[in-house]
UniProtKB/Swiss-Prot annotation:
It comes from Arabidopsis thaliana. It holds the Pfam family Glyco_hydro_19. This is Chitinase-like protein 2. No chitinase activity. Required for proper cell wall biosynthesis in etiolated seedlings. Prevents lignin accumulation in hypocotyls. InterPro entries: Glyco_hydro_19, Glyco_hydro_19_cat, Lysozyme-like_dom_sf. The lineage of its organism: Eukaryota, Viridiplantae, Streptophyta, Embryophyta, Tracheophyta. Mostly expressed in stems, especially in xylem and interfascicular fibers. GO terms for cellular component: extracellular region.
């Protein structure tokens, strides 16, 4: 027979094992965060480099800063996109916080949301998502919650009127027979050549399977962040560069009224489709409104957006012509 003290000890041991197992399971089910994990640090040629594990890995100076999950949590994502799963939305159950954070992890070592102090990171996330929200919204003037609450309502263009196949690129990015290259994703991708370039960057065959962007939310966010981080042409800056101050305007840029800030991100992404058309451009103002609204909801406040002339590209000469940019209309068309 087992003595009472020994039996009690066995029960305590079993209870402890069960408790620890339950704790591990709960930890795995919780949202990922790097805030409680100390980074690995090494010095290379006098420069401090860090690795924070899954969210910011690969020894980067940017990984020494706050990661996105440190300042942008699930509840904030839900606040920004509060109507995305409403019954009248067109991508119910598709978009979620985890997909965004997983996608962002690929680009945080490159500075996405991690270039500079925490405030700078919060502003960049709001700026990027401001573009996303405006391009995937089904909001309108009298919509419940207001027109700015309906971002991520779409994940694809609902009624495309063409296949968006440009035969000029038939040698480099040939169209797959019967496939439509209409808008899909968080920053909707259009045209065979854009699907081809994006697929090459993400190592996914989007040219043959553009539908992947409407089937996988993480991939859809990755494609959008890649576009945000990548110059549209070799001699141009990226939207990320012009927003975080990495881009330094030349004399020609200054003469063309192109200055760093949110307005320049619109210029990089959409060029002459939107910019240099005055302050009454509805599409431009819609993008700016989403950014300001998201700054408020994320906890930064629109007063941190800077002077009005830097918020828009109303009088900026375009970085690029429309031939290098996708259609500026969102995927709700």
């Amino acid at each position: 027979m087992v003595s009472k003290p020994l039996f009690s000890l066995l029960l305590l041991t079993v209870a402890l094992v069960v408790f620890q197992t339950g704790t591990l399971v709960n930890a795995e089910d919780s949202e990922p965060s790097s805030s409680t994990r100390k980074p690995l640090v090494k010095i290379v040629k006098g420069k401090k480099l860090c690795d924070k594990g899954w969210e910011c890995k690969g020894w980067s100076e940017y990984c020494c800063n706050h990661t996105i999950s440190d300042f942008f949590e699930t509840y904030q994502f839900e606040n920004l996109f509060s109507k995305r799963n409403s019954p009248v939305a067109h991508a119910v159950g598709f978009w979620d916080y985890r997909s965004f954070i997983t996608a962002a992890a690929e680009y945080q070592p490159l500075g996405f949301g991690t270039a500079g102090e925490k405030l700078q990171g919060m502003k960049e996330v709001a700026a990027f998502l401001g573009h996303v929200g405006s391009k995937t919204s089904c909001g309108y003037g009298v919509a419940t919650g207001g027109p700015l609450a309906w971002g991520l309502c779409y994940n694809k263009e609902m009624s495309p009127d063409q296949l968006y196949c440009d035969d000029y690129y038939k040698l480099t990015y040939p169209c797959t027979p019967g496939v439509s290259y209409h808008g899909r994703g968080a920053l909707p991708v259009y045209w065979n050549y854009n699907y081809g370039q994006t697929g090459e960057a993400l190592k996914v065959d989007l040219l043959s399977h553009p539908e992947y962007l409407e089937n996988n939310a993480t991939l859809a966010f990755q494609a959008a962040i890649w576009r945000w981080m990548t110059p549209p042409k070799k001699h141009l800056p990226s939207a990320h560069d012009v927003f975080v101050g990495k881009w330094k305007p030349t004399k020609n840029d200054t003469a063309a009224k192109r200055t760093p800030g949110f307005g320049a991100t619109i210029n990089v992404l959409y060029g002459d489709q939107i910019c240099n058309s005055g302050f009454d451009n509805d599409e431009m103002n819609n993008i700016v409104s989403h950014y300001l609204y998201y700054l408020d909801l994320i906890g930064v406040g629109r007063e941190e957006a800077g002077p009005h002339e830097k918020l828009s590209c109303a009088d900026q000469e375009p970085f690029s012509s429309s031939s290098s940019a996708p259609p500026s209309s969102g995927s709700s068309s």
